[in-house]
From Swiss-Prot:
This is Cytidylate kinase. Its main location: cytoplasm. It catalyses: CMP + ATP = CDP + ADP; dCMP + ATP = dCDP + ADP. GO terms for cellular component: cytoplasm. GO terms for molecular function: ATP binding; CMP kinase activity; dCMP kinase activity. SUPFAM superfamilies: P-loop containing nucleoside triphosphate hydrolases. Keywords: ATP-binding, Cytoplasm, Kinase, Nucleotide-binding, Transferase. Belongs to the cytidylate kinase family. Type 2 subfamily. It comes from Desulfurococcus amylolyticus (strain DSM 18924 / JCM 16383 / VKM B-2413 / 1221n).
Length: 185
């Protein structure tokens, strides 16, 4: 049984790494961000608009956080991916990984991933990050820029996807060996 959470800002590479880890180890993959995106779709608003709405309506975040926590509690082998997820599930996971990269690189990645002009990607990302930081401080008293809760922080600026995965894999293998023998063998 292993539970791993990936957090970090948009475009950092956290989703890429979380999905790779889930696939490699045969773990369930859960995205808290997909809940937020689905909520936006149901409401017929963009992510940045939902972020603005969530500044005034805490029930949005609280519901997503509740669903994330329940999913992790009810799962044995799972990888969780979310900007703020690590703070929500901190006490019930085996490994907390923070993935980051400089803003310029993250904007380029977001624009490429979403097929969005750079200016729009920058505006949307800044709005989302500001809104998330403010909401989490207000609702939980947590500063998402304080990464001291994480077991591993990895900056993807100078390393590729495979190099980052190998670093993460080495830590996971160590944890699995200590817990109950390696799942990757």
């Amino acid at each position: 049984m292993v539970k791993i959470v990936f957090s970090g800002p948009p475009g950092s590479g956290k989703t890429t790494q979380a999905k790779r880890v889930a696939e490699y180890y045969g773990l369930k993959y859960f995205s808290a961000g997909s809940l937020f995106r689905e909520y936006a779709r149901r409401k017929g608003v963009s992510l940045e608009e939902l972020s603005r709405i969530a500044l005034e309506d805490p029930s949005i975040d609280l519901e997503i956080d509740r669903m994330t926590l329940e999913t992790v509690r009810d799962s044995d082998d799972i990888v969780i991916d979310g900007h703020l997820a690590a703070w929500i599930v901190s006490d019930i996971v085996d490994l907390k990984i923070y993935v980051t990269a400089p803003l310029t690189l993250r904007i380029l990645r977001v624009a490429g991933r979403d097929n969005t002009p750079l200016g729009k990607a920058l505006a949307e990302t800044l709005i989302r990050e500001y809104s998330q930081r403010r909401r989490f401080m207000e609702y939980y008293g947590i500063d998402i820029y304080d990464t001291s809760i994480f077991d591993l922080t990895i900056n993807t600026k100078l390393i590729g996807v495979e190099e980052a995965f190998n670093i993460i894999k080495s830590i996971i293998d160590k944890i699995l060996k200590e817990k109950h023998g390696s799942m990757s063998e």
